[in-house]
Amino acid sequence: MSKQTFTTTFAGKPLVVEVGQVAKQANGATVVRYGDSTVLTAAVMSKKMATGDFFPLQVNYEEKMYAAGKFPGGFMKREGRPSTDATLTARLIDRPIRPMFAEGFRNEVQVINTVLSYDENASAPVAAMFGSSLALSISDIPFNGPIAGVQVGYIDGEFIINPDKEQMEASLLELTVAGSKEAINMVESGAKELSEDIMLEALLKGHQAIQELIAFQEQIVAVVGKEKAEVELLQVDADLQADIVAKYNVQLQKAVQVEEKKAREAATEAVKEMVKAEYEERYVEDENLATIMRDVAEILEQMEHAEVRRLITEDKIRPDGRKIDEIRPLDAVVDFLPKVHGSGLFTRGQTQALSVLTLAPMGETQIIDGLAPEYKKRFLHHYNFPQYSVGETGRYGAAGRREIGHGALGERALEQVLPSLEEFPYAIRLVAEVLESNGSSSQASICAGTLALMAGGVPIKAPVAGIAMGLISDGTNYTVLTDIQGLEDHFGDMDFKVAGTREGITALQMDIKIAGITPQILEEALAQAKKARFEILDVIEATIAEPHPELAPTAPKIDTIKIDVDKIKVVIGKGGETIDKIIAETGVKIDIDDEGNVSIYSSDQAAIDRTKEIIAGLVREAKVGEVYHAKVIRIEKFGAFVNLFDKTDALVHISEIAWTRTANVSDVLEVGEDVDVKVIKIDEKGRVDASMKALIPRPPKPEKKEEKHD
């Protein structure tokens, strides 16, 4: 296929798609140019079904530093593992396209997005999401798209689609919403305590804007789209399924209704093992035993799936016996750990998270050097999910995509209520350790984070709580669930996480397994989540109503002084010599920003006070009319040089020593002598003249003798 180009304008920027020129061996490939951002997307499918029991979709988002005209950092000077932002963007693209593949589709699919040029005012992630959908849609891969996504901002009561960098910095909302023509199927958002009504309107505005992008994709597919390949879907043997259902459905139904998680898991596993043992013995001589046993496992999974959903939709019974809108038992504890700067333990049913706060000087902020201009990140929220939290063994190592994503969600939820840098000049790190998990652990980490911040004396604007909502839908009827547990998440259609304060929402995240959800479901889920959020905030506020008035004794104390910008170089000194000397003498940490704010950190208040004294001396300026207790440092014929303070000297001219004539300076003053002087002049070069006689009362003039006349 020869190169074909398609052009439109979207949200005030040119959107250009090129097909047929590059990556022609992929099943589908596009080059998307949005503004000056350029993204190459290639989609590839394996020829055979994978052997696993899940859909092996892999989405990558690769940031090439040349796209922003930068050299990669580090010794190797080449791109390494994906950055946190790249990982989050890959997840952002994966989530809306995953539901658009058929049930039972098991071929491996890879969608690789490579950022070739970067424009900070034209979203490369949005272009990559568009390119991913389009590459799949024009390929022979059986993808039931297209989908598209947009960013939505909110400034002065107006919604803005795909805001530029300046607009996003002023926005009260940072929302990414994706979906198909019919419905929304992915949401990721941070917000500055916005109401449910505003958030819902933002979602609908975003979905409305998506229609234009989907129509553009459909236009392109009509011209260059390939015929979809016929692929084998995972299907179980109908006779085998009927046999197992008839024999064991009742037993499995009883097992599913055991309320306690561990007991329920043991009961369902016992039924499954019994069934597997029977059919393995029956077909042990069959050459297709592996396929039969795979079908048996899939049938049992489908039976459990169907029973959980039936109980909720028809009988309104949840696996643990709760009502549809009921939250599991809650518990909140602060100051769980000694020595640390703050800690909070939050428990919701069988989900438990411990959050630990660490405060540090601003010099500890994380430097982010990606495609965007380098910046410093003051607040970090890290999420850890050890396998023991679900009673299992498993991999231990660096954080995976899921842990990075959950940490970022908590970060967005909590950063909206943090004090400004001027109010609280600390770098802040929260680490969430999930100790138990039966669903909604990311939201438990948000609640625990609130407890840790308040226990640590961080003056947050308001407590934040999070709740996960679920959905069971048969296409006609649906049930929205409050505080979903693991089984409801696994077998449900939606995981909709909502975090916020009593004033409004600070973060949203939604993933679904069906094609999309309606505005009515969104509205109901947001209303139900608000009620639940307030219940959780009641428990948090009953435990700790306000942030502790003081920091922990182990936290670094801080004092801030302001100096003139032109004095920064004086405090730092040549090659950092002066500031290093201060730090060596006092043992403190010092941060100086470009505005002249000097932050001094130490656990020793006396060291802070001494540092302030030294810096004040360094930046102090002589003023006309002020009196100083000075020391004579040099004597010349024309006067004496005195040190007023630190590195500021002044000249006391011979005529300013006394009201009477001074013949020789050395007759009156000597080096090392302390004298009081008054500054009388500072010239344009900063040279200081001082006077001793100005502090001495001027003697009266001698009276003239009267002349006698004869």
Swiss-Prot record:
Residue ranges of domain KH in the record: 556-615
Coiled coil: none
Gene3D superfamilies in the cross-refs: GHMP Kinase, N-terminal domain, K Homology domain, type 1, Nucleic acid-binding proteins
Residue ranges occupied by any S1 motif domain in the UniProt entry: 625-693
Localization annotation: Cytoplasm
UniProt cross-references to SMART domains, sorted A to Z: KH, S1
Broad class of where this protein is predominantly found: cytoplasm
SUPFAM superfamilies, per the entry: Eukaryotic type KH-domain (KH-domain type I), Nucleic acid-binding proteins, Polynucleotide phosphorylase/guanosine pentaphosphate synthase (PNPase/GPSI), domain 3, Ribonuclease PH domain 2-like, Ribosomal protein S5 domain 2-like
Domain of life the protein comes from: Bacteria
EC number: 2.7.7.8
A single MF term (Gene Ontology): RNA binding
Entry cofactors: Mg(2+)
Matching InterPro entries: ExoRNase_PH_dom1, ExoRNase_PH_dom2, ExoRNase_PH_dom2_sf, KH_dom, KH_dom_type_1, KH_dom_type_1_sf, NA-bd_OB-fold, PNPase
Keyword field contains Nucleotidyltransferase: yes
Positions of the UniProt region annotated as Disordered: 691-710
Gene Ontology biological-process entries: mRNA catabolic process; RNA processing
Record's function text: Involved in mRNA degradation. Catalyzes the phosphorolysis of single-stranded polyribonucleotides processively in the 3'- to 5'-direction.
NCBIfam families: polynuc_phos (TIGR03591), PRK11824.1 (NF008805)
Annotated family: Belongs to the polyribonucleotide nucleotidyltransferase family.
Protein name: Polyribonucleotide nucleotidyltransferase
Organism: Streptococcus pyogenes serotype M5 (strain Manfredo)
